[in-house]
């Protein structure tokens, strides 16, 4: 593994190795406290962030490395100076680049023109670090992730894409339950289905909640992406039937709940569920750091 732009570039064994390493780092942090000693990692943010920024900054520190934070400064990467020059400069100083960007093409440019590993910490198409943290969390409760049935509910987006691709590679069953007109990208769904054929997994897209009865895990996300100015009344009309609430858990028999956050309580998920016995949401947030640490250790070993 030279970079992490999308989980589709990883094999099943590489994903399992990352999950195993994440568990090892989580269980024995002192053993890895100097693993990145002398390493400097530039973290770039074109989009706002809480969990991504804090977990990368603290995670790198816990591994003995040094994180250098860059915000959007005078605009997106490539506006003030070319992506080529940006990547070439950063590569002379830093040992890796972690980038949360508007466009996947920016990440591809950083890889093309830079000479250090690049990690996608979110783009318009994928959120691979989130998906690794999600399956790390699932693996803490299910010994064989290939037997897990995971339902994503809400708007098809970058998180959905990475969940489907990761589940497909691992051989799990992943169903995206989205209102009509909000399905995941058709080409990425096609890629996930092809990967699932190889692994024995299953990928589904539906708008019917009855299709996820007897699933193991349900996964929520915000109904409104950053920068979306759709009136709340319209959003609620479209998505409220897909709210994750106690009634839905009873109806489907689902045991565990995930949400990548930020969560809008009483919209896509109720406080009763988010703070309840079925919720793994804050374990999931913690696991962002451990999964990302595993990625950095693998890239910089």
Swiss-Prot record:
Chain positions recorded as L-ornithine binding sites: 158, 221, 225-226
Give the UniProt keywords, A-Z: Amino-acid biosynthesis, Arginine biosynthesis, Cytoplasm, Transferase
Indicate where this protein is primarily found: cytoplasm
Quote the protein name from its UniProt record: Ornithine carbamoyltransferase
Q: Where in the cell is it found?
A: Cytoplasm
- Look at the named UniProt entry and state the broad enzyme category this protein falls under: transferase
- This entry's Enzyme Commission designation comes to 2.1.3.3
Domain of life where this protein originates: Bacteria
Q: Which gene encodes it?
A: argF
Q: In which pathway does it act?
A: Amino-acid biosynthesis; L-arginine biosynthesis; L-arginine from L-ornithine and carbamoyl phosphate: step 1/3
